[in-house]
């Protein structure tokens, strides 16, 4: 058996997407494994964002799996890692972990992790071999929305200021770099080196959705961001708005600003005719997790975040961040 690991190529993308769906759908026990992920797409957007961070594995010249690195400045994670079911339990996955570790090192990532199935000892054991350790559960949460705001949202809206938000797609091109600097300043204040500029630009250039920029009531200071995918061919899929990352600056108004941000996301979703919001909440970020429950989000499924060196990173009880590292 001849194993070859290399960078993923554009002409691999269809096969890589097929293997990803088949792998995850088979593991989850679906009658039709290829229906997993619906019409969402993880492979193409992540490859387009950074081809140097997309990896392929071949056996005897045939593509059998892929893996991706995502870097947010000093923070990085990898996945989804997929191997064709024919090659499960043959020690193949480890060949796709080594190159991502090398990539994380080259990018000088200080805080690295991944998301995996909490119920699978096999997955957890594999990653522990490389010094990734399970910490808190991450809940993938959803909220169904309607044209008329439900009573709970109205109640919350009355308690908190109305959003003062701008969407990145509405900003003039000549000032976008300044806005990106503000975003970097905000996230760096939450965790040193955390930088979502690449993610914001990927969403903008690939037309995957939009980024909400939440300002204080004066409209002068950025207090939060929410990077959202929506629609077919994105990581969300049809009729879904997926909050891939959101963060609120740390201050006395963090909790109320978090609710304002959720209001802004919901308003955008309603405007786009979208009926569901999906977002990940690490349970170590207790106040954010609790706020999402109070807002009407419910857990759809749970995984576990595994952290290199067992670092806590930005997962503290009082940190208002949304992400899931899938």
Where would I find each of the regions flagged by the language model?
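Amide-forming acyltransferase catalytic core, primarily the GNAT-like/NAT-type
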Residues: 129-242
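Conserved active-site alpha-helix within GNAT-family acetyltransferase domains
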Residues: 90, 94-95, 106-111, 118-137, ...
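Glycine-rich phosphate/pyrophosphate-binding loop shared by adenosine-nucleotide-utilizing enzymes
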Residues: 60-66, 76, 220-225, 241
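Conserved acetyl-CoA binding element of GNAT-fold acetyltransferases
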Residues: 74-86, 236-251
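GNAT/GCN5-related N-acetyltransferase fold signature
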Residues: 57, 69, 83, 214, ...
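Active-site rim helix/loop that mediates acceptor-substrate recognition in acyltransferases
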Residues: 13, 17-68, 191-212
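Conserved acetyl-CoA-binding loop-helix of GNAT-fold acetyltransferases
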Residues: 80-83, 89-106, 111, 128-129, ...
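Conserved GNAT acetyl-CoA-binding A-motif
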Residues: 78, 104-119, 271-281
């Amino acid at each position: 058996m001849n194993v070859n690991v290399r960078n993923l190529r554009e002409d691999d993308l269809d096969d890589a997407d097929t293997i990803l769906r088949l792998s995850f759908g088979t593991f989850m026990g679906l009658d039709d494994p290829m229906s997993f992920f619906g019409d969402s797409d993880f492979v193409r957007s992540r490859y387009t964002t950074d081809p140097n961070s997309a990896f392929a594995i071949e056996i005897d010249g045939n593509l059998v799996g892929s893996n991706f690195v995502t870097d947010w400045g000093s923070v990085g994670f990898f996945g989804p890692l997929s191997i064709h079911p024919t090659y499960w339990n043959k020690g193949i996955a480890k060949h796709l972990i080594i190159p991502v570790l090398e990539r994380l090192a080259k990018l000088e990532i200080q805080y690295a992790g991944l998301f995996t199935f909490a119920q699978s000892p096999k997955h957890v054991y594999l990653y522990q071999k490389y010094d990734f350790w399970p910490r808190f559960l991450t809940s993938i949460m959803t909220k169904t929305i309607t044209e008329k705001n439900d009573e709970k949202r109205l109640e919350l809206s009355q308690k908190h200021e109305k959003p003062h938000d701008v969407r990145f797609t509405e900003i003039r091109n000549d000032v976008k770099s300044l806005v990106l600097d503000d975003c970097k300043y905000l996230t760096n204040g939450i965790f040193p080196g955390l930088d979502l500029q690449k993610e914001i630009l990927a969403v903008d250039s690939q037309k995957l959705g939009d980024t909400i920029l939440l300002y204080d009531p004066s409209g002068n200071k950025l207090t939060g961001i929410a990077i959202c995918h929506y629609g077919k061919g994105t990581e969300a899929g049809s009729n879904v708005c997926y909050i891939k990352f959101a963060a609120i600056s740390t201050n006395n108004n963090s909790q109320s600003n978090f609710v304002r941000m959720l209001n802004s996301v919901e308003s955008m979703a309603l405007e786009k005719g979208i009926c569901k919001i999906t977002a990940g909440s690490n349970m170590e970020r207790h106040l954010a997790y609790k706020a999402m429950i109070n807002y009407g989000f419910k857990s759809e499924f749970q995984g576990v975040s595994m952290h290199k060196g067992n670092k806590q990173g930005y997962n503290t009880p009082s940190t208002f961040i949304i992400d899931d590292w899938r």
